[in-house]
C-alpha cells in the first residue's frame, strides 16, 4: 500500500516548506517555499557556503555603501538558494519580500521587481517564481499591481477570512493560510486541546477553500504552517499544502489511508462587491487572533531578516 504522503500527492499538490536542498531531494515535492527564517536556517548549512560567498562577492560589485551591500547580498542569497531549489522541483519557488516592507506598497513592488530581475539574470523565467508578501492591505494592493504585470504572488501570514477574501478580489495567484499558528493561538487562549477535525486552523482553511470554489475564484489555496499530520490529512484535497521536512518524513513513514476532505463546489455563484479598505480593516480588526498572529509573524520574520543581515555584514567586512 502507498504511504500516506504518496496517497496525499494524488489529491493535493505537495510543496516543501524549506530551504534545505537535501530534504527537497528526498521528498520530491512539486514546488518549494522559503521565508526569511528558512533562509537564515539554510545559510547555516555548510553546503551553502558557496552560495553565500557568491552573494557577498556580487553585492560588493554593486555598491560601495555597506547598507546597500547588505541589502543586495540578502536578496542575492535568497535568489541563489531559490535557483538551486529550482534545479530539483518541476514547479515554482516562493521567495519573500522583506517583512519590514509589509506596510509599504511601493517599496514592496520595487523589491519584487528586484527579486524577479535577479532570477532572470540567473536564467530563471518569472513563470517559475512566486513573490511572497504579507497579507496586509498594502501587501495585497502591491500583489494586485504585480499580478497585472504578470508577476505571480503568494500572500502569506494569512489568518483571517477578510484577508483571504481581499486576496481573491485582488486576483492574487496563491494564498498561504496558516493552520498551526491559528491552533497555537486558540490553545493558549482557551486552554483546550483540539482534534484535527475541530482544529481552528483546519476549520479556517476549509471555510476559505469552500468560499473560493463556491464563487469561482482562481486563487490557489495552499495550506501552510502545520503542527501535526492530522491537520494535513484533514485538508487532503486542498489545492496545495506546503509542509516542512519533519512532517513530510512522518507522512512518508505513515500508512494511514486517506480520502479527500476538501471537494470543490459543482456550481458557482457570483461574489458580492469587493471589500473597501475601510471594510477590510474593520473586518480584520474584529478577529483578535488574526491581528495578533499577523503582527507577530511580521515581527518574527523581521527579526530573522535582521539576524541574517548581521551575518552578511560580518562577511562583507572580510
Swiss-Prot record:
GO terms for cellular component: cytosol. Pathway: Carbohydrate degradation; pentose phosphate pathway; D-glyceraldehyde 3-phosphate and beta-D-fructose 6-phosphate from D-ribose 5-phosphate and D-xylulose 5-phosphate (non-oxidative stage): step 2/3. Keywords: Cytoplasm, Pentose shunt, Schiff base, Transferase. It catalyses: D-sedoheptulose 7-phosphate + D-glyceraldehyde 3-phosphate = D-erythrose 4-phosphate + beta-D-fructose 6-phosphate. GO terms for biological process: carbohydrate metabolic process; pentose-phosphate shunt. One of its GO terms (molecular function) is transaldolase activity. InterPro entries: Aldolase_TIM (IPR013785), TAL/FSA (IPR001585), Transaldolase_1 (IPR004730), Transaldolase_AS (IPR018225). It holds the Pfam family TAL_FSA. It is found in: Cytoplasm. Its EC number is 2.2.1.2. PROSITE patterns: TRANSALDOLASE_1, TRANSALDOLASE_2. Transaldolase is important for the balance of metabolites in the pentose-phosphate pathway. Homodimer. Belongs to the transaldolase family. Type 1 subfamily. NCBIfam families: PRK12346.1, talAB. This is Transaldolase. It comes from Shewanella sp. (strain MR-4). The gene is tal.
